[in-house]
Amino acid sequence: MSDYEEAFNDGNENFEDFDVEHFSDEETYEEKPQFKDGETTDANGKTIVTGGNGPEDFQQHEQIRRKTLKEKAIPKDQRATTPYMTKYERARILGTRALQISMNAPVFVDLEGETDPLRIAMKELAEKKIPLVIRRYLPDGSFEDWSVEELIVDL
């Protein structure tokens, strides 16, 4: 008998029995009271008046109109974020552009014998010829769009 066979002995296994299904009794569930005009009656006949966030309040929240994408966009003259490209944006831009170049996207700089897509993307970034837009989200849900040409890049 080898060590391999001993691992599969007839001892108790440490797992649950997955064949047994558990169903809860339907009797344990109670019906929720129906609120009409913020009031209902309980089993004893007492009137319960709802306050706070009742069904009516949630209906009012559903009626609030959400802002569209155009309304969330901040115009160029009202931008609040820094015009400098962060290292995270730089990494994302270079990686995205290198992937595009590796998939035979047109290159906007002279190659000069360069074959590495990341080096070509770095050269495009240095000359600010990458045709991508960075979207910066703000805490209130609005966003600013910056083109790569507009951002100041520290190389």
From Swiss-Prot:
Against PROSITE patterns, the record matches this protein to: RNA_POL_K_14KD
Which residue intervals are annotated with compositional bias (Acidic residues) in the record?
A: 1-19
**Sequence ranges of Basic and acidic residues compositional bias:** 20-39
**Keywords for this protein:** Cytoplasm, DNA-directed RNA polymerase, Nucleus, Phosphoprotein, Ribosome biogenesis, Transcription
Report the subcellular localization. Answer: Cytoplasm; Nucleus
**Entry-annotated residues carrying Phosphoserine:** S24
Spell out the GO cellular component terms annotated for this protein, sorted alphabetically and separated by semicolons: cytoplasm; nucleoplasm; nucleus; RNA polymerase I complex; RNA polymerase II, core complex; RNA polymerase III complex
Q: Which GO terms describe its biological process?
A: nucleolar large rRNA transcription by RNA polymerase I; ribosome biogenesis; RNA-templated transcription; termination of RNA polymerase I transcription; termination of RNA polymerase III transcription; transcription by RNA polymerase I; transcription by RNA polymerase II; transcription by RNA polymerase III
Disordered: region residues: 1-57
For this protein, the record's InterPro entries field holds: DNA-dir_RNA_polK_14-18kDa_CS (IPR020708), Pol_omega/Rpo6/RPB6 (IPR006110), RPB6 (IPR028363), RPB6/omega-like_sf (IPR036161), Rpo6/Rpb6 (IPR006111)
Molecular function per GO: DNA binding; DNA-directed RNA polymerase activity
Name the domain of life.
Answer: Eukaryota
Q: Where is this region: Leucine-zipper?
A: 111-132
What does the function comment of this entry state? DNA-dependent RNA polymerases catalyze the transcription of DNA into RNA using the four ribonucleoside triphosphates as substrates. Common component of RNA polymerases I, II and III which synthesize ribosomal RNA precursors, mRNA precursors and many functional non-coding RNAs, and small RNAs, such as 5S rRNA and tRNAs, respectively. Pol II is the central component of the basal RNA polymerase II transcription machinery. RNA polymerases are composed of mobile elements that move relative to each other.
Recorded hits in PANTHER family, A to Z, give: DNA-DIRECTED RNA POLYMERASE SUBUNIT K (PTHR47227), DNA-DIRECTED RNA POLYMERASES I, II, AND III SUBUNIT RPABC2 (PTHR47227:SF5)
What is the annotated quaternary arrangement, including any partners? Component of the RNA polymerase I (Pol I), RNA polymerase II (Pol II) and RNA polymerase III (Pol III) complexes. Component of the RNA polymerase I (Pol I) complex consisting of 14 subunits: RPA135, RPA190, RPC40, RPA14, RPB5, RPO26, RPA43, RPB8, RPA12, RPB10, RPC19, RPC10, RPA49 and RPA34. The complex is composed of a horseshoe-shaped core containing ten subunits (RPA135, RPA190, RPB5, RPO26, RPB8, RPB10, RPC10, RPA12, RPC19 and RPC40) where RPA135 and RPA190 form the DNA-binding cleft.
Could you share any additional remarks the record makes about this protein?
Present with 6090 molecules/cell in log phase SD medium.
The protein here is known as DNA-directed RNA polymerases I, II, and III subunit RPABC2
